[in-house]
Amino acid sequence: QFEYWKKDFNAFTTQFAKEPLEGNSYVDMIDIESVAKFLITFNLVHNMEINHPKSVFLHKEGNGKYVMGPIWDFDWAYDYEGTSNHFGRYNTPLFSSSMNGVGTAFFQRFLQDSRVKAIYKRTWQDFKNNKLDALLQYVDDYAVMLKPSVERNSELWENTRSFDTKVKELKTWLRNRADYIDSEAVSYT
């Protein structure tokens, strides 16, 4: 089975690498809406894992298209990579020429396709206008649920004593990051 999937995925990547990208039939092999949503998720939380993907998944059922996800491994998110601190810079691009990882080249290529960019822009604008506030409320609700555990944990470990401050920092960072992504997505046509 491994050889079957290896051959199948290699066929996709070979097609994806062909020029011109516009009109390229690679879109018959991967769900580009799932790609756009995947990119939005990683961009919103600035998960640099995408640049050197050792924890990136996609899946495919039968003769269907590849679909990005499930998502996981977010320990290098929220500006942690390179700084070892969360919630610092919110205005840093997800992709960087200094990264030079295989993920950088692979995922940036999707954003060279106007079909993906159009889905990205539409999906992002819908999220920002209609769902961001719900996400921030979820952060508050989840923090309330975690509070008893955080208090017990703080009896042993000092790193959770600033929990309330970190929740506020997370929400502020997400709002600022969303505004930053707006400035990127507005140019997508």
Q: For the regions a protein language model found, what residue spans apply to each?
A:
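Middle-to-C-terminal accessory/interaction subdomains
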Residues: 1-52, 56-188
